[in-house]
């Protein structure tokens, strides 16, 4: 029971570390990809990792990893720290917190497991109209075409943002991981209907975005 209480307290502290960042007057959070707000989320994540005695790695597209190893064959537990506009506080953050908790357990129990906790940049499409940018670029599976022309809500191109930050749109492919695990909040009603708290996802619906232009003619009667 004592260990369980400590785990809950640590989980609450992790959550509070991120809680106010990007808060809005409507009660949600706005943490757009490759914004200063998302930067702050990643800096907090780095600090929490260093508290565990872990090393911090930032890759060529700005993704952040907290790691206890420099060896190949590691387990990667990851998610994202950005959000949609007026998003929820658990989306993405819960998966990163879960990884930090696993790393803490391994350290406290003396379990030697090569582990990395990852936070991928710009998972949501709210800023550029295009999702999974950080993870998509490093896997070489999502973006076969150039995406540097994408424009942020502030009117700045992704290419310009990357250049300013010293990042590249053509990074090396991620390597060395043995398995990947992501805990995520449910964004549906399956668990509730099944009256269970946890499920294992078998398939994922791929996101598709459309931009629609409507040309209208206005007719009025006298």
Regions found by a protein language model. Give the residues of each.
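Conserved small/polar residues in nucleotide/adenosyl-binding loops
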Residues: 219-222
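A non-catalytic alpha/beta surface segment that caps or lines the substrate-entry region
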Residues: 23-69
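General structural feature for long, well-ordered alpha-helical segments within catalytic domains
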Residues: 7-14, 37, 41-48, 102, ...
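Short beta-strand elements
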Residues: 199-216
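Acidic/histidine-rich catalytic neighborhood of metal-dependent amide-processing enzymes
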Residues: 84, 94-198
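Alpha-helix capping and helix-loop boundary segments enriched in small/acidic/polar residues
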Residues: 2, 6, 87-90, 126
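N-terminal capping segment at the start of a domain
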Residues: 2-35, 121
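Catalytic-core environment of secreted peptidases
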Residues: 48, 52, 60, 64-91, ...
């Amino acid at each position: 029971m004592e260990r369980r209480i400590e785990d809950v307290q640590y989980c609450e502290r992790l959550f509070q570390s991120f809680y106010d960042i990007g808060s809005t007057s409507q009660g949600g959070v706005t943490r757009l990809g490759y914004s200063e707000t998302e930067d702050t989320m990643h800096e907090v994540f780095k600090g929490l990792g260093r508290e565990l005695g872990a090393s911090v790695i930032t890759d060529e597209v700005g993704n952040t990893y907290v790691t206890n190893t420099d060896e190949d064959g590691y387990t990667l537990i990851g998610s994202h720290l950005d959000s949609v506009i007026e998003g929820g506080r658990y989306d993405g953050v819960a998966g990163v917190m879960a990884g930090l908790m696993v790393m803490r357990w391994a350290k406290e129990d003396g379990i030697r497991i090569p582990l990395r906790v990852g936070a991928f940049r710009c998972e949501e499409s709210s800023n550029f109209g295009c999702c999974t940018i950080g993870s998509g670029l490093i896997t070489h599976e999502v973006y076969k075409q150039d995406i540097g022309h994408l424009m942020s809500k502030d009117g700045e191109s992704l290419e310009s943002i990357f250049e300013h930050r010293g990042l590249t749109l053509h990074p090396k492919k991620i390597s060395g991981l043995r398995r990947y695990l992501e805990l995520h909040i449910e964004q549906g009603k399956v668990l509730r209907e099944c009256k269970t708290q946890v499920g294992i996802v078998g398939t994922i619906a791929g996101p598709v975005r459309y931009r629609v232009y409507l040309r209208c003619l206005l007719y009025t009667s006298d």
